[in-house]
């Protein structure tokens, strides 16, 4: 069984019942961190991004989208960001496939609400993730749940496993935020609609075929 099929089979088996604490994620992380470009049929010199005019578009390649989880690739042109955004009631595993990315993370100071959409947050730090290590960034419902991804001077691709998936019917819609004031590590986050586009791309035959194959797994 390929490493991807191992991940999908395991995710279908244990999600969404798995506890959201980091310690219980080991069974997923141990497989997820081993996935490489070759497993996804990606030729690293041939990046998944396309020339664009404003530099504000990230390309989205779904691999599995079901009611339990989403597995997808986000491909960044150089010097491009996904603005600060949240993952309400969700856990996310993120791994860089090629290139490197900077991740600024935040947490709500008052996290008693599962559907909080504005207020004071604390900046929890910046991590640089790259393809030369096997580090997996773990985003939890109440820990580093709000973040911003920024690519550097090279193309970059990030593999994400999100569970449960975004779903507005269950108050899990993605909200983008803009800091309106900063006091040390404390920021006020207000929702806004950024000049940004995350575009689904169906032009890559290898990834399309992989999407079809993986979506059949139970």
UniProtKB/Swiss-Prot annotation:
It is an enzyme of class 1 (oxidoreductase). Its EC number is 1.13.11.19. Keywords: Dioxygenase, Iron, Metal-binding, Oxidoreductase. One of its GO terms (molecular function) is metal ion binding. Signal peptide: none annotated. It catalyses: cysteamine + O2 = hypotaurine + H(+). The keyword Plastid does not apply. InterPro entries: PCO/ADO (IPR012864), RmlC-like_jellyroll (IPR014710), RmlC_Cupin_sf (IPR011051). Its cofactor is Fe cation. This is Probable 2-aminoethanethiol dioxygenase. It comes from Dictyostelium discoideum. The lineage of its organism: Eukaryota, Amoebozoa, Evosea, Eumycetozoa, Dictyostelia.
């Amino acid at each position: 069984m390929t490493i991807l099929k191992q991940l999908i089979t395991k995710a279908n088996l244990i999600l969404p019942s798995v506890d959201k604490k980091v310690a219980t994620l080991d069974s997923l992380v141990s497989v997820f961190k081993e996935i490489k470009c070759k497993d996804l049929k990606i030729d690293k010199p041939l990046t998944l991004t396309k020339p664009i005019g404003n530099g504000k578009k990230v390309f989205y390649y779904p691999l599995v989208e079901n009611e339990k989880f989403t597995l997808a690739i986000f491909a960044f042109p150089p010097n491009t960001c996904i603005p600060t955004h949240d993952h309400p009631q969700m856990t996310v595993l993120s791994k860089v496939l090629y290139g490197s990315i900077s991740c600024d993370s935040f947490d709500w100071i008052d996290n008693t609400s599962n559907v909080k959409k504005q207020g004071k947050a604390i900046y929890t730090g910046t991590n640089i993730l790259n393809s030369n290590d096997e580090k997996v960034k773990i985003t939890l419902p109440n820990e580093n749940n709000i973040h911003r991804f920024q690519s550097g001077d090279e193309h970059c691709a990030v593999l994400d496993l999100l569970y449960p998936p975004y779903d507005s019917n269950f108050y899990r819609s993605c909200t983008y935020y803009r800091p309106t004031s900063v006091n040390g590590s404390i920021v006020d986050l207000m929702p806004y609609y950024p000049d940004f586009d995350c575009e689904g791309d169906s032009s890559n035959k290898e990834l399309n075929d992989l999407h079809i194959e993986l979506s059949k797994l139970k």
